[in-house]
């Protein structure tokens, strides 16, 4: 096993410090840092960026040849951490805990260590590791807000108010595919320069928002909407099938058969994991694809309607305007002027 002790402070020093302990170089561009895992420890990449609002976005994608343990120690900053598991699993505990807590694929952890308390993350050898990690400097985040923190919901206030690290926080979140989708958008984004910096900042806030929605829902009395991990995988099969077959979708029973779940379970799963019905999800994906097709400019509106699997141009215009505030024709005109 390899152990790395990282001191978390006000500067962007997590990746530089990790690079120093790994004995590798790191890259830096417009505040975004990255390093490659050395071959003696496996393969992969660590990247991260901190923003003026106190939100830091870090992504680890690796296949370690040895078990890896990160020890995160707080300095003058007492951060709040949101850690999402994209692949396989990782383990977490505070230094004085006897047992490790396992965070599975599509789950997340909301945590904060107390003063001088060490938080540990453990990644298995010979397993695909993919996590997205938000590090929130709670003091900076409060200063960035245009309103008083005390005005927000009580349970969320308790997460962000403790800038001195008086209380330990450890909340394991239920499964979410919506967060996974946002992270995958980050991973597939190929923009560079200042547009990339702004894109990453917006996506970091989107991930934070999704995690807070889940945390708020789980904090409600009597909240018991829990899916089995196997069902989460089947819902992912269903959503991937929808994404890849928008032009030929038939109905919900067809999607249910593909996923291997009954229609009631499919609907329940989409509500929990995407906060949408199946039909709402399909409509959203069609509208997202419509923007892409219309922007490319090599299809007319009737061709786009067919490629989206719709039969009515008037219905398409209606839902497009409801979503974007203008008709497809107006969108095309504005895009070409």
Could you say what each language-model-derived stretch is?
Residues 1-78:
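N-terminal low-complexity or simple alpha-helical regulatory segments
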Residues 2-6, 93-95, 100-227, 252, ...:
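Alpha-helical bundle regulatory/interaction domains
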Residues 55, 64, 76-98, 106-108, ...:
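Glycine- and acidic-residue-biased ligand/ion/polar-headgroup-sensing regions
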Residues 200, 242, 266:
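Conserved hydrophobic/aromatic pocket- or pore-lining residues that grip, position, or stack substrates
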Residues 236, 240-254, 272-311, 333-337:
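Terminal helix-turn-helix DNA-binding modules in bacterial transcription factors
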Residues 265-266, 270, 315-316, 320:
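Short hydrophobic/aromatic patch on the recognition helix
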Residues 318-337:
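…primarily DNA-binding HTH/wHTH and HhH modules…
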């Amino acid at each position: 096993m390899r152990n790395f002790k990282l001191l978390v402070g006000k500067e962007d020093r997590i990746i530089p410090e990790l690079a120093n302990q790994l004995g590798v170089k790191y890259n830096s561009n417009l505040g975004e840092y990255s390093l490659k895992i050395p071959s003696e420890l496996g393969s992969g990449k660590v990247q991260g960026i901190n923003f003026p609002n106190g939100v830091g976005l870090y992504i680890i994608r690796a296949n370690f040849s040895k078990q890896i343990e990160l020890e995160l120690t707080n300095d003058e900053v007492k951060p709040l951490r949101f850690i999402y598991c994209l692949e396989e699993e990782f383990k977490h505990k505070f230094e004085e805990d006897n047992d490790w807590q396992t965070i599975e694929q599509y789950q997340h952890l909301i945590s904060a260590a107390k003063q001088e308390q060490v938080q540990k993350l453990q990644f298995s050898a010979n397993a695909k590791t993919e996590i997205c990690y938000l590090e929130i400097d709670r003091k900076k985040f409060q200063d960035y807000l245009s309103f008083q923190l005390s005005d927000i919901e009580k349970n969320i206030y308790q997460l962000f108010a403790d800038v001195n690290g008086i209380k330990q926080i450890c909340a394991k979140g239920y499964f979410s595919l919506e967060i996974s989708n946002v992270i995958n958008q980050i991973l597939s984004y190929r923009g560079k320069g200042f547009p990339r910096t702004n894109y990453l900042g917006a996506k970091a806030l989107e991930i934070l928002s999704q995690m807070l929605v889940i945390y708020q829902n789980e904090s409600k009395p009597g909240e018991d909407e829990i899916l089995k991990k196997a069902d989460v995988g089947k819902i992912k099969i269903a959503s991937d099938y929808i994404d890849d077959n928008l032009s030929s979708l038939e109905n919900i029973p067809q999607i249910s058969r593909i996923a291997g779940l009954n229609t009631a379970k499919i609907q329940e799963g989409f509500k929990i994991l995407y906060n949408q019905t199946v039909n709402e999800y399909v409509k959203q994906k069609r509208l997202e694809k419509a923007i892409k097709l219309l922007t490319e400019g090599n299809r007319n509106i009737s061709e786009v309607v067919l490629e989206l699997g719709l039969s009515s141009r008037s219905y398409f215009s209606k839902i497009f305007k409801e979503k974007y505030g203008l008709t497809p024709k107006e969108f095309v005109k504005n895009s070409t002027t």
